From Swiss-Prot:
Record's keyword terms, sorted: Hydrolase
Organism name: Yersinia pestis
InterPro entries referenced in this protein's UniProt entry, alphabetically: AB_hydrolase_fold, Dienelactn_hydro, Dienelactone_hydrolase-like
Entry EC number(s): 3.1.1.45
Catalytic activity: 2-(5-oxo-2,5-dihydrofuran-2-ylidene)acetate + H2O = 4-oxohex-2-enedioate + H(+)
Enzyme class (EC, first level): hydrolase
TM segment ranges: none
Active site residues according to the UniProt entry: C137, D194, H226
PANTHER family listed in its UniProt record: ALPHA_BETA-HYDROLASES SUPERFAMILY PROTEIN, CARBOXYMETHYLENEBUTENOLIDASE-RELATED
Name by which UniProt lists this protein: Putative carboxymethylenebutenolidase
GO molecular-function term, one example from the UniProt record: carboxymethylenebutenolidase activity
Family: Belongs to the dienelactone hydrolase family.
Length: 267
């Protein structure tokens, strides 16, 4: 069992060389909670990566992704996009979480919150002329949608986000519907063993992207399932996750969202 001293040491390693913590962002008449991480070895401004949560909210795994990006030289920020409808931590059953909370969060609300997040970042050390987004699971779908929403976005990376699905008043479109509207290059990272996103859905999306002549690429990892980057779950597939992480960083750089060089001792 981990001791308090061990836990403190681990947290110190995770936060060495960066500033990180909770903040709030004015958005749509509310104060939107968010987690932010950025380097402390440079005056900025920093290229910005918006990190969009899994269905479980901005929990430790998403915060860790922000810290990892900060150690690469980015200002990374993850807004709590469910906060008006509820708190994911209040649910222990995934089906109840999805039906009672996640499905009640309107896409329109989410996209505007992300706009306000980008604006806030531009006033707090971020360079939104170098703006990217990445999202996981629920957030992977949102990353596709945001790439068709914000013309200032330079790059997007969507990790195992649903591509097609049942449309509702709150979820009127899926990535396959916005392929023709993409205004930023998108990299999709998917698992070949993901039963929730079958191969035919991926092929449908690829066809839509080709028809739209979109600047996008989908990578499928044959041995990975859903949530293969979630290193706190049995679904984690280290080889695919590590390759996907490097592809994400390369995608950002390739499309004009290069990280600020950070001294190796802070990484």
């Amino acid at each position: 069992m981990a001791t308090a001293h061990h836990t403190d040491q681990l947290h110190s390693l995770q936060t060495h060389g960066i500033h990180c913590g909770e903040t709030t962002i004015p958005s749509q008449g509310d104060e939107l909670p968010a987690y932010i991480a950025k380097p402390d070895q440079h005056t900025g401004p920093y290229p910005v990566v918006i990190v969009v949560q899994e269905i479980f909210g901005v929990h430790e795994h998403i915060q860790d992704i922000c810290r990892r990006l900060a150690k690469q030289g980015y200002l990374a920020i993850a807004p709590e996009l469910y906060f008006r409808q509820g708190d994911a931590k209040d649910y222990s059953n995934i089906n109840e979480l999805v039906n009672n909370l996640v499905k009640k969060v309107p896409d329109r609300q989410v996209l505007v919150d992300l706009d306000h997040t980008a604006h806030w970042a531009s006033r707090h050390g971020g360079d939104t002329k170098k703006l990217a987004i990445t999202g996981f699971c629920w957030g992977g779908r949102i990353a596709w949608l945001y790439a068709a929403h914000n013309p200032q976005l330079k790059a997007a990376v969507a990790w195992y986000g649903k591509l097609v699905g049942e449309k509702t008043l709150f979820l009127p479109k899926y990535p396959v519907d916005v392929a023709i509207d993409l205004c930023a290059p998108v990299l999709g990272l998917y698992g070949g063993k993901d039963t929730s996103i079958p191969a035919e859905h991926i092929e449908t999306m690829r066809q839509a992207l080709r028809a739209a002549n979109a600047d996008a690429e989908i990578i499928v990892y044959p041995e990975a399932g859903h949530a293969f980057n979630a290193d706190y779950r049995p679904s984690y597939h280290a080889e695919s996750a590590q390759d996907g992480w490097q592809r994400m960083l390369d995608w950002f750089t390739q499309h004009g969202v290069s990280a600020i060089p950070i001294p190796e001792e802070t990484q």
